[in-house]
């Protein structure tokens, strides 16, 4: 992916987050997307979140189970960031319908 496409995709993801709308999977529109592209998009997406005041408070790792990796067609875990806007305090409650799009648990 070229830099413009990476920036455009990150902006689209950021807009969909703010508007709480579902978008077509990136792999459907960009079948050539690879892990390098994904991490570049993630870094740009984080920059957009930081530009509106979010702060990085941690890192995350996902897709650690071989069963989940097989289900998703990948062969390694993925790594990402956590911002203060993603924080949910212990024992607090929130509405899944109002907060999450296609929630999943590993």
Language model region names:
Residues 2-106:
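Active-site microenvironments in enzyme catalytic cores
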């Amino acid at each position: 992916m070229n830099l413009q496409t990476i920036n455009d995709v990150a902006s689209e993801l950021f807009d969909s987050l703010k508007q709480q709308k579902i978008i077509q999977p990136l792999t459907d529109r960009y079948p050539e997307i690879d892990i390098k592209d994904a991490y570049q998009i993630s870094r740009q997406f984080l920059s957009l979140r930081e530009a509106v005041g979010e702060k990085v408070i941690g890192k995350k790792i996902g897709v650690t189970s071989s069963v989940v990796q097989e289900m998703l067609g990948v062969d390694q875990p993925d790594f990402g960031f956590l911002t203060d806007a993603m924080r949910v305090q212990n024992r607090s409650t929130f509405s899944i319908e109002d907060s999450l799009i296609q929630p999943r648990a590993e």
